[in-house]
Every structure is written in structure tokens, then in C-alpha cells.
């Protein structure tokens, strides 16, 4: 397996960096406790730490103080805060090489290169194209150099060929169906002022609005679009991975590059290995990259299935990172009780879990656990454990439609009382997504497209599991009482549905 370069680990953030809180972050106990991140956690601050956080939230920079810089790193790593960057065009040419792997598709390549007129170094890696002359002609017209691979080795091998030839500190990997717009690189490069950042990805958006129902669905729910909110990237985070379609990487961090034995999911594996090596990977939606989405039904469905086949390989390489559902034992027990016909027992389980979580949180906030009235610990516990159990319908429904439907459908046929609950759980996520996104597509076709999307992905998951002889990507991951983390702070139990699409 290709290895990433060893990262800086607990490198302090640069002095002078500015931070802003994530929209989900909150301060409690007169600023002495801060909550937020994904998964949610609670941090108890010292008095100097609380003063630093208050100053940062008001716009002050991180001072040249080791303890303050270490605290800022913790806030960034947990997702409680995000960097505020000074995005200005560099005075000279950026010291970055753009690498574009391509096999055939000269028209798409020409469109991609047209958006790179300001890039100083561009390498096109011809990965065994049938018409090499067409690729060479397009690249020459744009002033790009061409590296030829005699046989097709896949995207990982092509990217590695370009990586080996680049001699700049940064490399930007772009797929040939990307359409760069003005300023995309200028918005990403400031992240690398932090020596711990190994890679940054922009938001992938449709290059142009399509008219078909599938094009409109893709415009709102593409698996390449990781959303509107910035994030640290790692398994279990709000953004658990970023696609390799557009990715700027510190060459030192890239090491030997992508795993060439993976034809699908190699970009997810690469990003996760960067994180495991101590590098930080960030997602910044302030930078956008146009993309020509697949909008032909057969091609689109086949690609979804291909994505699913990578789940088994990724789970074997990164144990616990690709599961259909992540849940606390309390949440899982409450839903199981409700599913078998005992909603009252489920409510008791939820109440018990809320009380126990409040007791643990009170140890952090310094409150009296026995006095719930006005208690920040109880409010947070009710929101996370109580409210989280109710909100679990969404990821649970997604897990059923994206992974478990081959078992859920026979169960619904055999047991009549399961039909309505299962149907409600499966339909809830796409309907809620439609309400959130309000795409230019009616809810009936949007829900149908989403379910078709899920079926394609799940077929790939099951196929990959059969080929790799593992069931791990089919199993939920339950978290017990001990939620200790390498990131200091108390992790708050919750439930998420995660994994590469």
C-alpha cells in the first residue's frame, strides 16, 4: 500500500491565525465550558483558555503563546472552530503544479485546461488513451506538458505518475471533467500557512444546470458535493472524506501517493492515510470547482454501484471507518425497543441515558447533577441524548435504504407490523433532504432518484463484501460508555450515518 508522508502531529497553529466558531459551537458556565464539533464534545477550559476563546470569537488573532496555540489547534482539530483566512491573490505565480489524469475525453480536457490559464505548471497524464494524438494536441494548445502511460493503470497510478514528476511544494489534482473557475486556487492556498495542513479540498458544484430530472437531482445531491459548511476531514467528522476530483496537497504529505491497487475509493483511502499520518485535511466550501456530472441514467447508476464496491476495501484498510450506522448503545437500545413494539421501554432507555449523560457532563461544567433546574449539563444532555434519539430516524432510515434493504424488504413482507415503520424510516431521509435543499425538482421524483441512488450504492456494497469476504461494512458500530478520544474532551453520544458515497 502507498504510504503518506509522516505528518507533524501536534504541531501548534501559527501565531496570528484567526478563528471563528462553528455554527454548532456553544459556550457554557460563563465561558469556562465549550461544546461543539462533530461528533459533539465538551471541553472544560482554564480561565486563561476561556479568555483566549472569548478574544478569538471577537476577531482577535491567536497570540504567540504555546498554550494558546495548542488550544487553538485542539479547537480546529475537533471542529469546534475553523480558520479565518486572508484570501488575496498571490503577488507572483503560485508554487503549485496542477496534475490532470485523463483517458481519452479530449473535449472535457480542453474545457478543464481553459480554466487553468493562470496556473504556472500543468501536467496532463495520458493514462493509455486510445487517441493519444488528440490528448497531446489539446494539452499543447493550453501550454501543458504531457506524460504518457503506455497502458491504462487507473486514476491512482496516473496521479502518482504526475506526482513523481512535480517539483513544487504543492500539487493540485484535478479530474479532467472539472471546470475550474476564477479564484479557486487562491481561496485554498492560504490554508497551507498552517504547517500541519496536508491537503485542502474545494466544494464540487455543477458546471451548468441540467434540465433533465437526473441532472436536477445531481445538481442538488451529488455525492461529490460535501455541503456548505467547512470542516476538518476525517472518519466520523461532518465531512468524513473529500473526493479526489479536486484536491490540493502538500507534496511532502503525499509521500508515495495513491494506492494503485484500488480502482475505486483510492481518493478516500489517500485522504484517510494523510489524517492517520498526522496531517490535517480540510474542506473549504468558500472555494468551488465546477464539475460535469454524469446525467445519463445507466452510466450514473453504474458509477453509484462502483462507489459502493469500495466500501469493503476501505473498511479493511481503515477498520471502523465505513459502517452504515454509528450509534451510542443507548440510542440503539431505544430504537430497538420501539421497533419490537415497546415504545414505552424505549422512552425509559432514552431517559436513563439522558440522566447518565447529564451526570457526566455535570462533572465537566462543575454543576450539581441532582439539581436539573437551570442546569447547562441537563440541557445539553437532553439535546444530545434525548433529542438525538428522536433525530436518529434520519440516519437510521438512510442506513436501511443504503445498506440494509436486502434484509429489510423480506422482513417487511414477512412481518406486517414492520411495513409502516420501515416505509416511514426509508422515506423520511429523502423527504427531509428535499425540504432542506428545495431543489428544482418535485418531491416525488427527488425521493425516487434518492432511493435509486441508495439502491445502486448498496448493490455495490454487498458485491464488495462478497468479493472481499467480509461483512463489516454491513454492521453498525455501537459506542459504549467509554467515549475517550485522542482529542481531549468528553465525547457526547450520538448517531450518524457515514461512509464514502
Predicted regions and their residues:
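A short, conserved alpha-helix in the catalytic core of glycosyltransferases
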Residues: 243-249, 253-288
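Conserved donor NDP-sugar-binding/catalytic core segment of glycosyltransferases
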Residues: 182-216, 292
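Short, flexible, basic/aromatic active-site loop/helix in glycosyltransferases
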Residues: 202, 218-239
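Acidic donor-binding/catalytic loop of UDP-sugar-dependent glycosyltransferases
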Residues: 107, 131-132, 178-191
Amino acid at each position: 500500500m502507498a504510504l503518506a508522508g509522516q505528518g507533524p502531529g501536534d504541531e501548534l497553529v501559527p501565531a496570528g491565525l484567526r478563528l471563528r466558531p462553528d455554527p454548532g459551537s456553544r459556550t457554557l458556565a460563563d465561558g469556562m465550558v465549550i461544546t461543539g464539533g462533530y461528533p459533539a464534545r465538551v471541553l472544560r477550559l482554564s480561565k486563561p483558555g476561556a479568555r483566549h476563546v472569548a478574544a478569538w470569537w471577537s476577531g482577535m488573532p491567536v497570540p504567540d503563546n504555546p498554550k494558546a496555540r495548542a488550544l487553538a489547534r485542539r479547537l480546529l482539530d475537533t471542529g469546534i472552530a475553523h480558520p479565518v483566512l486572508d484570501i488575496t491573490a498571490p503577488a507572483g505565480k503560485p508554487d503549485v503544479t496542477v496534475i490532470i489524469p485523463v483517458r481519452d475525453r479530449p473535449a472535457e480536457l480542453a474545457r478543464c485546461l481553459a480554466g487553468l490559464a493562470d496556473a504556472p505548471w500543468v501536467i496532463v497524464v495520458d493514462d493509455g488513451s486510445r487517441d493519444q494524438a488528440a490528448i497531446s494536441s489539446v494539452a499543447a494548445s493550453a501550454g501543458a506538458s504531457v506524460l504518457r502511460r503506455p497502458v491504462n493503470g487507473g486514476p491512482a497510478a496516473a496521479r502518482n505518475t504526475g506526482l513523481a514528476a512535480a517539483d513544487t511544494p504543492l500539487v493540485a489534482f484535478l479530474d479532467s471533467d472539472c471546470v475550474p473557475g476564477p479564484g479557486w486556487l487562491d481561496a485554498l492556498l492560504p490554508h497551507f500557512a498552517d504547517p500541519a495542513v496536508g491537503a485542502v479540498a474545494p466544494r464540487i458544484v455543477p458546471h451548468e444546470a441540467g434540465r433533465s430530472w437526473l441532472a436536477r437531482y445531481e445538481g442538488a445531491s451529488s455525492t461529490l458535493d460535501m455541503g456548505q459548511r467547512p470542516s476538518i476531514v476525517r472518519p466520523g467528522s461532518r465531512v468524513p472524506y473529500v473526493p479526489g476530483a479536486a484536491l490540493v496537497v502538500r507534496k511532502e504529505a503525499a509521500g508515495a501517493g495513491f494506492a494503485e491497487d484500488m480502482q475505486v475509493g483510492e481518493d478516500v483511502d489517500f485522504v484517510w492515510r494523510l489524517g492517520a499520518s498526522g496531517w490535517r485535511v480540510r474542506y473549504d466550501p468558500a472555494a468551488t470547482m465546477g464539475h460535469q456530472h454524469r446525467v445519463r441514467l445507466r452510466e450514473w447508476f453504474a458509477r453509484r454501484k462502483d462507489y459502493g464496491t469500495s466500501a469493503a476495501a476501505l473498511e479493511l484498510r481503515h477498520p471502523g471507518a465505513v459502517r452504515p450506522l454509528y450509534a451510542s448503545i443507548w440510542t440503539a437500545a431505544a430504537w430497538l425497543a420501539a421497533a419490537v413494539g415497546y415504545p414505552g421501554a424505549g422512552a425509559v432507555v432514552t431517559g436513563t441515558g439522558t440522566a447518565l449523560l447529564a451526570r457526566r457532563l455535570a462533572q465537566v461544567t462543575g454543576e450539581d447533577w441532582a439539581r436539573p433546574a437551570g442546569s447547562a449539563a441537563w440541557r445539553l444532555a437532553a439535546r444530545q441524548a434525548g433529542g438525538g434519539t428522536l433525530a436518529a430516524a434520519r440516519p437510521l432510515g438512510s442506513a436501511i435504504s443504503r445498506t440494509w434493504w436486502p434484509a429489510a424488504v423480506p422482513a417487511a413482507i414477512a412481518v406486517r407490523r414492520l411495513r409502516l415503520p420501515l416505509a416511514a424510516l426509508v422515506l423520511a431521509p429523502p423527504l427531509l433532504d428535499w425540504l432542506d435543499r428545495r431543489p428544482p425538482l418535485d418531491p416525488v421524483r427527488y425521493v425516487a432518484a434518492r432511493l435509486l441512488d441508495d439502491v445502486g450504492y448498496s448493490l455495490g456494497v454487498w458485491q464488495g463484501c462478497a468479493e472481499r469476504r467480509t461483512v463489516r461494512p454491513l454492521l453498525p458500530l455501537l459506542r459504549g460508555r467509554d467515549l475517550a478520544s485522542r482529542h481531549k474532551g468528553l465525547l457526547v453520544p450520538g448517531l450518524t450515518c457515514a461512509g464514502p458515497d
